[in-house]
């Protein structure tokens, strides 16, 4: 049976050799499927995927990203099917994931995907990464986690230092423009609370109250801080228009300010590319406050409604996670040809003449943390970051809730457009909150904000009623 697996991105140079070895091993293990990876380039991902789904193109497995096109949206349009009828046959696969990870794959009371457990989500949202050498050079022995004013001062001094060092003006970045300033939220008296990250419309309080984030005091505070930062030149003036790759290109040369993106491995890249002796560490405001667990799972793999055999995808995942050997083969290729293992959990990739890794499959789509290998030059802090388990954490009541937007499709698409037009310029500090928020909220309301939030509250109330443990867990 074919096992066509649709993912975003592009295939590695030596894909054919690697996947042939995977199929050989599957055959030797008596698994009657033939794996083929179908990649859709990021730039065309939304359009191409929608086209595949609407035309009924046959494939077996779909990678689902909750922050791009979430599982409930795919399930609501009938693109993926419930896996519950088949799970009894795969007890080992079921046992690989925690109860909370499985909660993250529920839609209308049924499991619609297999979780991908590639990292801990205990520290997903509110961290910043900072160049420690620069921080110390400009007079801060440690990250000033108790004061936003000091963080801004650190950013200003770091910007000047990095400009002298690299000739590049460094900026504070969001991971994506849609993101919320979660790092600031830890400094507010109303914390813990969580703002849903894909649109930022929903502010969820720990008691289950759903507030309108863009109409909240918290959003006002975020904007006032970012206005100060933008006016001080700490945010790229072209942030809403430039290609996102610019931020990574600059960061790899050492030019970034404390930001809610990047990771400790960035420090290694900077050293390799520039020779600057630096380390990058993850920090947060008010570390004594609890972590916010805001999702049980961020990536999943689902069975396509157009699958030739509904179990091919499950057979593949069951085989993939059955051993570290299978996991190594699929993700890293043939030992000695595509990679060399370094100890139990490190790896050296073999590259082609253009310095491209010959063969690798992204672990964030199909990896399993206990089996994953990290680059031999990745700092220990990177592994700590990926595997971190919080001692002190609260779980957001919306962590396991997946909103089904099918009743508010029109409002949703109008709001998506309007948020970019009216909210982004205020959020990144380009224009002042005071002068622009009333018009922005009026525009959101015209686009259907209240209808959207009412639908969200209705579904969320039903979810709380069906799952009374949620608010207990959120205490």
Give the residues covered by each predicted segment.
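Extracytoplasmic/secretory soluble proteins
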Residues: 1-475
């Amino acid at each position: 049976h074919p096992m066509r697996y649709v993912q975003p991105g592009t295939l590695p140079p030596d894909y054919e050799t690697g996947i042939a070895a995977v199929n050989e091993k599957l055959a030797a293990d008596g698994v009657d499927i033939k794996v083929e990876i179908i990649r859709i380039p990021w730039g065309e991902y939304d359009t191409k995927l929608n086209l595949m789904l609407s035309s009924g193109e046959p494939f077996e497995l779909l990678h689902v990203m909750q922050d791009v096109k979430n599982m409930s949206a795919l399930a609501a349009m009938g693109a993926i099917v419930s896996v519950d009828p088949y799970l009894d046959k795969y007890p080992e696969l079921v046992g690989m994931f925690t109860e909370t990870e499985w909660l993250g794959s529920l839609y209308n009371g049924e499991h619609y995907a297999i979780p991908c457990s590639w990292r801990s989500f205990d520290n997903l949202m509110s961290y910043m990464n900072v160049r420690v050498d620069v921080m110390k050079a400009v007079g801060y022995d440690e990250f000033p986690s108790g004061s936003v004013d000091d963080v801004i001062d650190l950013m200003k001094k770091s910007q000047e230092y990095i400009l002298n060092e690299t000739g590049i003006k460094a900026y504070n970045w969001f991971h994506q423009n849609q993101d919320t300033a979660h790092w600031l939220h830890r400094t507010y008296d109303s914390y813990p609370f969580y703002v849903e990250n894909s649109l930022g419309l929903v502010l969820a309080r720990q008691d289950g109250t759903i507030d309108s984030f863009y109409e909240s005091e918290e959003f006002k505070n975020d904007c006032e801080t970012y206005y100060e930062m933008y006016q001080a030149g700490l945010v790229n003036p072209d942030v809403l228009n430039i290609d996102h790759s610019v931020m990574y290109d600059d960061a790899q040369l050492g030019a970034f300010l404390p930001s809610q993106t990047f990771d400790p491995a960035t420090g290694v890249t900077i050293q390799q590319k520039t020779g600057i002796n630096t380390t990058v560490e993850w920090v947060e405001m008010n570390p004594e406050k609890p972590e916010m667990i805001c999702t049980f799972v961020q990536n999943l793999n689902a069975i396509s409604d157009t699958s030739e055999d509904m179990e091919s995808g499950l057979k593949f995942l069951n085989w993939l996670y059955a051993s570290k050997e299978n996991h190594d083969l699929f993700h890293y290729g043939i030992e000695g040809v595509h990679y060399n293992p370094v100890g139990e959990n490190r790896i050296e990739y073999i590259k082609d003449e253009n310095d491209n890794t010959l063969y690798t499959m992204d672990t964030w789509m199909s990896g399993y943390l206990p089996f994953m290998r990290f680059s031999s030059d990745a700092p220990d802090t990177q592994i700590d970051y990926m595997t971190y388990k919080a001692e002190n954490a609260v779980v957001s009541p919306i962590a396991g809730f997946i909103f089904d937007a099918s009743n508010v499709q029109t409002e949703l698409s109008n709001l998506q457009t309007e948020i970019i037009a009216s909210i982004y310029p205020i959020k990144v500090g380009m224009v002042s909150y005071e002068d622009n928020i009333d018009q922005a909220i009026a525009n959101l309301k015209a686009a259907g904000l209240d209808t959207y939030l009412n639908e969200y509250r209705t579904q969320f109330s039903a979810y709380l009623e069906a799952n009374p443990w949620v608010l207990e867990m959120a205490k």
